């Protein structure tokens, strides 16, 4: 009569392992204090590689990319060129203004003096014309002419009389000397020096 083999049950299979674990736990020695302190230190000093990778990734992200650096350098060069061009234009304008001012300051002093003299003469002529215009408005020209002729006749008579009174040693003073001593214009008296006499007498 054949006998069938008996298969071991799960309880039978687990029984030795349980026994082994119980034996191990019973045979395990308690951990010493120095060993526990070393384990604590090793835990604190241990660094996970994931944290190192994360830190490296963040640092890489913060660093500028080569393309960004190239663009920034291009913009920087362009800004420097623009600033250099602006400074060059400003310097050229300053030099031009300085040359113009120097050219103006180099005007000859003789030319300035001639201009001042011309302005003074024109001002005096304008003043006299205004006076003539004013007298013409206020007075009659015929009356003025009559008074001028009367004054000339009186002046000529006085000069003749002075010439006779001032004669010394039978020698009379010339009319030219008398007119020059009084500072009278020959044209006002109608006096001719070549003839040494008045033209309207």
Swiss-Prot record:
It comes from the Eukaryota. Residues 1-111 are annotated as: Disordered. The keyword DNA repair applies. Residues 71-103 have a biased composition (Basic and acidic residues). It is found in: Nucleus. Residues 109-131 form a coiled coil. Component of the swi5-sfr1 complex. Residues 12-29 have a biased composition (Polar residues). GO terms for molecular function: transcription coactivator activity. Belongs to the SFR1/MEI5 family. GO terms for biological process: double-strand break repair via homologous recombination; positive regulation of DNA-templated transcription. This is Swi5-dependent recombination DNA repair protein 1 homolog. InterPro entries: SFR1, SFR1/Mei5. One of its GO terms (cellular component) is Swi5-Sfr1 complex. Keywords: Coiled coil, DNA damage, DNA repair, Nucleus, Transcription, Transcription regulation. Component of the swi5-sfr1 complex, a complex required for double-strand break repair via homologous recombination.
């Amino acid at each position: 009569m054949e006998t069938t083999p008996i298969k071991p049950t799960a309880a039978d299979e687990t029984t030795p392992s349980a026994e082994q674990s119980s034996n191990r736990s019973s045979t395990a020695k308690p951990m010493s204090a120095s060993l526990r302190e070393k384990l604590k230190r090793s835990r604190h000093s241990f660094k996970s590689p994931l944290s190192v990778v994360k830190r490296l990734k963040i640092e890489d992200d913060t660093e500028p990319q080569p393309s960004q650096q190239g663009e920034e350098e291009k913009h920087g060069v362009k800004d420097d060129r623009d600033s250099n061009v602006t400074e060059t234009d400003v310097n050229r304008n300053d030099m031009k203004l300085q040359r113009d001012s120097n050219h103006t300051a180099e005007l000859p002093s003789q030319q300035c003096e001639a201009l001042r003299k011309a302005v003074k003469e024109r001002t005096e002529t304008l003043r006299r014309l205004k006076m003539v215009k004013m007298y013409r408005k206020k007075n009659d020209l015929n009356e003025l002419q009559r008074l001028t002729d009367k004054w000339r006749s009186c002046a000529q008579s006085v000069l003749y009389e002075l010439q006779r009174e001032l004669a010394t040693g039978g020698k009379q003073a010339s009319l030219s000397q008398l007119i020059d001593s009084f500072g009278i214009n020959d044209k006002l008296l109608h006096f001719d020096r070549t003839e040494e006499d008045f033209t309207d007498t």
